[in-house]
Amino acid sequence: IPKIENIRPQMKRIEIGADLNGSELAQVTRVLTTTSEVERFFEDLADSEIELLRLYQWQKQLVNLPELTRQLKTAIDEDGRVTDDASPELRTIRNNIRRSEQTIREQLDGLIRGGNAKYLSDTIVTMRNDRYVIPVKQEYRGVFGGVVHDQSASGQTLFIEPKQIVDSNNRLRSHQIAERSEIERILAELSAALVPHRRDILHNATVIGHLDFINGKA
């Protein structure tokens, strides 16, 4: 039986209308998944005509929630990240983000190659303030135009967002804001789906804990 976390605080929070984050939902998902696995294990024992009456008394208390389990496993991965499969809208937004990032990198790669290399401290693309920038030598700050987002400790390098990519960076930022909003909506929806089942889920966690304890003593 896998070790599961204490989910009592999470169940308390959804009871008062709070939303769980991805990591917290992943913890609840582990309880539900383990419930399903324990149920299958006991079904296999029954098929084998093996009787463990003491354990069956605990198993009978489990409430399997297959549809809720499937919904959570589809939307939240084991690390608590909201997956692309969580909603068609999120998949579309993330595809837009990937395309925007690819476009920006291609634009910047074109800028830092060839003759422009002499204006740069290094021919790399990096990030400042969630914007793609390039490291430009202080004395050439006017070559690329655009926005200065940061400078090196020595002041010899400026991290500049060239004017050619400002619009692309703005589009990317817009997609990222949309992604965050959709993730918040999904987390709220999943948290709300748990509310009617919170007592069953909490009791399942207690039963699994007892079974794990008994297994440890065996």
Where are these regions (language model features)?
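Long, non-membrane, amphipathic alpha-helices that form coiled-coils
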Residues: D79, A86-S100, S168, H175, ...
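Non-transmembrane, heptad-repeat alpha-helical coiled-coil rod segments
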Residues: I177-H210
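SMC-family hinge/dimerization module
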Residues: I124, R128-P162, N169
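Conserved amphipathic alpha-helical "coupling/scaffold" segments
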Residues: I1-E89, I93, H197-D200, N204-A218
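Surface positions of alpha-helical coiled-coils, especially the charged/polar e/g heptad sites
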Residues: E24, V82, A86-E89, I93, ...
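Coiled-coil heptad-register positions
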Residues: E43, L108, I112-G115, I183, ...
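Extended, charged coiled-coil "arm/hinge" scaffolds of SMC/Rad50-like chromosome-maintenance ATPases
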Residues: N64-D77, D167-A188
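Extended, Lys/Arg-enriched charged tracts that mediate electrostatic binding to polyanionic substrates
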Residues: R91-Y140
